[in-house]
Amino acid sequence: MSRRHKAEKREINPDPKFGDLVITKFMNAVMLHGKKSVAESIVYGALDAIEATAKSEPVALFHQALDNVAPHIEVRSRRVGGATYQVPVDVRPERRQALAIRWLINAARGRNETTMVDRLSGELLDAANNRGSAVKKREDTHRMAEANRAFSHYRW
């Protein structure tokens, strides 16, 4: 770790359409090679598709999907006397959000639909209904933490 001053958190602006900071973070995570306008059209297209199919507020459904994917506990490796233990630890809120965003995007990229808009809207709908690859990833993480509960006293 650096002994100098801590890096300041950068200020990000809320997205222009919904005025939501989390959607901006999501957009930045979808973005590849600095192409923000492409990422913006993908995310807004997916939210419009959700609104058309689910007939509900897309931002609320997006936040519901993020909450369903976000892990509450994870395992971290801890070396104790020559042995490496997988120690369950609570996930900080910022990391919880970042993991949920990353898992949703990776799950969407792994789907079979033709366009990224379709893949992302499908994964968001699945996550909002507690199914899909991203939710499975969260359940696997929780299962790992539960299996290693015996090592929770090694927490730091």
From Swiss-Prot:
InterPro entries: Ribosomal_uS7, Ribosomal_uS7_bac/org-type, Ribosomal_uS7_CS, Ribosomal_uS7_dom, Ribosomal_uS7_dom_sf
Gene Ontology molecular-function annotations: rRNA binding; structural constituent of ribosome; tRNA binding
Gene Ontology cellular-component terms listed: small ribosomal subunit
BP terms from Gene Ontology: translation
Pfam families: Ribosomal_S7
Family under the similarity heading: Belongs to the universal ribosomal protein uS7 family.
Oligomer status and interactors: Part of the 30S ribosomal subunit. Contacts proteins S9 and S11.
NCBIfam families, per database record: rpsG_bact
Function: One of the primary rRNA binding proteins, it binds directly to 16S rRNA where it nucleates assembly of the head domain of the 30S subunit. Is located at the subunit interface close to the decoding center, probably blocks exit of the E-site tRNA.
Protein known as: Small ribosomal subunit protein uS7
The species this protein was found in: Brucella melitensis biotype 1 (strain ATCC 23456 / CCUG 17765 / NCTC 10094 / 16M)
